[in-house]
Amino acid sequence: MSSEKKHVFIIGSKGIPAQYGGFETFVEKLTEYQKDESIQYYVACMNAKRKRFKHNGAKCFNVTVPDVGPAKAVYYDIAALKAVYQYVVDHNIEEGIVYILACRIGPFLKKYVKMFHAKNIQVFVNPDGHEFKRAKWNWFIRQYWKLSERLMIKNADYVVCDSQNIEKYIQEDYKKYQPQTTFIAYGADVVDNSDEEKFEVWAKEHEVSKNEYYLIVGRFVPENNYETMIREFMSSNTKKDLV
């Protein structure tokens, strides 16, 4: 393996090829549109059918995870972290980045950060959103999420936020740790489909005019604030439709 390669290990997504999910799509597009050939990506994949394989030039490796309920994601991240460290040792990699998506393993991270630092490898974290506020979790799990987030921010070398508000929150709530943060927005493939026949039929059926509507796309879960958006739309003076 060339010593000039920049080794970047990504854990925390379910893996690629992406089936669904924001982190999965991020990793899919990051590797698909890679321009810098000096970077070698490694991607952890949960319960993949193959132990090791390549996709978009990334070296993907399977992490087998038992069904242990809500703790499944925590188990997965820790197992992936162990696998990455073993790979680093076995291949004598002495410089690189471990990029962890989401803040699930805060109580366990400090130990691994020290191990990776001994190999001159930095640990980056994407904190995602306010997981500890999600209504689907009970009180105990929400408390764990908040603790885990705090310890992830405390021990990470760098925090990559995909929301300006999340970056502001990290800087304010964890000011005492002086976190090094940056904001990198997600990209998107923008395609003009307004003239497609299916859209024309749908728009006519629902009496929706081109460029005269607001579009919301997302899952119907409490934290996506559909109720707030619909309520505010109804109280506004806009003449446009809401789709």
Protein language model features and the residues they cover:
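An aromatic- and histidine-rich active-site surface loop
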Residues: 74-83, 95-128
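A short, charged, and often flexible helix/loop element on the N-terminal side
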Residues: 58-82, 134-141
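Membrane-proximal helix-turn-helix segments that form the acceptor-binding/catalytic region
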Residues: 141-159
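A short, histidine- and acid-enriched strand-loop-helix "catalytic/donor-clamping" loop
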Residues: 68, 104-107, 124-141, 157-158
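A short, active-site helix/loop in glycosyltransferases that binds the activated sugar's phosphate group
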Residues: 153-181, 188-190, 199
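N-terminal strand-loop element at the rim of the active site
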Residues: 5-6, 11-19, 33-71, 165-167, ...
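Conserved donor-binding/catalytic core segment of Leloir-type glycosyltransferases
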Residues: 9-11, 203-224, 230-237, 243
